A protein has these predicted regions:
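C-terminal motif of bacterial Sec signal peptides marking the signal peptidase cleavage site
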Residues: 17-21
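Glycine-centered hinge/linker elements that transmit conformational signals in sensory
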Residues: 188-189, 238-277
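Extracytoplasmic/periplasmic solute-binding protein
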Residues: 141-147, 152, 182-244, 292
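C-terminal capping/gating helix-and-loop segments adjacent to ligand/active sites or protein-protein/ligand interfaces
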Residues: 337, 380, 386, 400-456
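Conserved N-terminal structural module of periplasmic/extracytoplasmic solute-binding proteins
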Residues: 4-8, 22-109, 125, 328-330, ...
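Hinge/lid segment of periplasmic solute-binding proteins
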Residues: 104-156, 162, 200-205, 318-325, ...
């Protein structure tokens, strides 16, 4: 389960000594005479990492404490609450003790922070990057390096779904038959209408087919970002545009498909459509406790869903992922694969802190402790050549992505990375989507926010 305390911690303490993030120690070190990782000698400088991913908070805290214990280098980590990273980054960068390591999500963000991003061309994290396309450039300058390679789609409980397939009257007899939107919707409709029957037959605790589609700040990005990616991707593809850089104007050609998927999510769920923005829903827990069969999210959910401390009933063997079938090229479609997690180094930091930060990141991707934490505790797929053998991904969702790619399916690019003024555009889309779903607005309002809002924000972002 994601760390719900993170947002409280951010409100109460944004100081550089705060420990609530993607990595960090549980307290500052009083010693500066430890030994650096590898062949480094005296411990100098300090590290302040501003983490993007709340669900990895605990693992990063433990990892950074280990590093401090080994080297004497003080590591402070702060994790932004869901949907609040840009706001938090702006606030922290304005402080005297600003982050030395921060995340940029795409080329537009890298452009925004170009005065702060150090050239990483001659660093270990770039040298070890297996696919150099997973680095962002500003001209010839390498401004950030991907720290994980992620996929998202529709998480599903394969144990329950396979059990359903064996029941009389099931829409399909095998999960493999679910390879397009129409079939997925027919299955979801049937499951949602037969919850009690399924529970009696399988001994399950189902309440719905799809986990709640929350539209609060902690969840809405799944739809204004990740589901919205689908119509963007297919339109960019049709237009011959760069799939991750996008184009200044869109027509909303595939928004009817977006509507069909969204309506399925909300109609085949037990959540009241009028309360989706309440913040009271927990889709992860619904899937984790076996109450839902389907849950749109990414491979970063594997670690919290399988962490025994969270008390969920699902196991790793129960979990898999299928594409967000969109009714366009379903039979050839894979998962959505990419990243919005790029490490950048603050070139305005003191040189000793820059050096300490680069050493810390190198240790994270080369040491046993670092690789174990990233692969196993965080459940991430790292894009570095050091992650072999025991440190290859054990994430069932990443494995599903690899299997689809091996079968010749086409991965969907993360076209949402092209979103101009991303927070503003998404907020307007979410507002319209919330009103539509609650019966207080029209779908035309969603289209307007999506299409006209894109043009408006693109013009503002590019000063046209």
């Amino acid at each position: 389960m994601k760390k719900k305390l993170v947002s409280v911690l951010l409100v109460s303490a944004m100081a550089a000594t705060m420990l609530a993030g993607c990595g960090g120690n549980g307290g500052s070190s009083d010693s500066n005479d430890g030994t650096q990782a590898g062949d480094k000698t005296a411990a100098t400088g300090s590290v302040y990492l501003l983490n993007f991913k709340p669900e990895t908070d605990e693992a990063w805290q433990n990892l950074a404490q280990t590093y401090t214990d080994q080297t004497g280098v003080d590591v402070t980590v702060l994790t932004a609450a869901d949907g609040q990273y840009n706001t938090t980054l702006q606030a922290e960068m304005a402080k005297a003790e600003a982050p030395t390591i921060f995340t940029v999500g795409n080329s537009a963000a890298a452009k925004t922070w170009e005065d702060y991003t150090m050239d990483l061309s001659d660093t270990a994290i770039y040298d070890h990057l297996t696919d150099k396309s997973l680095a962002l450039k500003n001209g010839d300058k390498i401004v950030s390096v991907a720290n994980c390679y992620e996929c998202y789609g529709i998480i599903y409980n394969k144990t329950i779904l396979e059990g359903y397939c064996g029941m009389d009257g099931a829409v399909v007899k095998s999960v493999d038959e679910i390879n397009n939107f129409d079939t997925l919707k027919a299955v979801a409709d049937d499951i949602n209408s037969r919850v009690d029957e399924i529970n009696d037959a399988l001994g399950t605790n189902l309440t719905e087919a799809f986990a709640s589609a929350g539209l609060d700040d902690g969840s809405s990005w799944r739809f204004s970002g990740h589901l919205a990616n689908m119509p963007l991707y297919y339109e960019f593809k049709d237009d011959g545009a760069d799939l991750t850089a996008g184009e200044e104007k869109i027509t909303g050609k595939y928004l009817d498909n977006f509507k069909a998927v969204w309506d399925m999510y909300t109609s085949d769920s037990a959540a009241d459509p009028k309360t989706l923005n309440s913040g009271a829903l927990n889709a992860e827990a619904e899937l984790g406790m076996g109450e839902a069969v389907f849950y749109q999210n990414g491979d970063w959910e594997f670690a919290p869903l399988t962490n025994p401390d969270n008390g969920y009933t699902v196991t790793a063997e129960d979990l898999s992922m299928m594409p967000i079938y969109f009714g366009v090229d379903d039979e050839n479609q894979g998962l959505c694969v990419g990243t919005e997690n790029y490490w950048a180094i603050n070139q305005k930091a003191d040189q000793e802190d820059i050096d300490a930060s680069l050493d810390f990141l190198e240790w994270c991707i080369t040491s046993d402790e670092g690789r174990d934490a990233i692969t196993n505790a965080m459940g991430l797929t790292a894009p570095f050549d050091t992650f072999t053998g025991d440190y290859e991904t054990k994430n069932a969702f990443a494995q599903a992505s690899n299997a689809l790619m091996s079968a010749g399916k086409t991965s969907v690019a993360w076209s949402f990375n092209a979103t101009p003024n991303v927070d503003t555009w998404r907020a307007d889309v979410v507002s319209a989507l919330t009103a539509y779903t609650a019966g207080e607005g029209s779908w035309d309002d969603v289209v307007t926010a999506f299409v006209d809002g894109w043009a408006d924000q693109w013009a503002l972002a590019n000063e046209q």
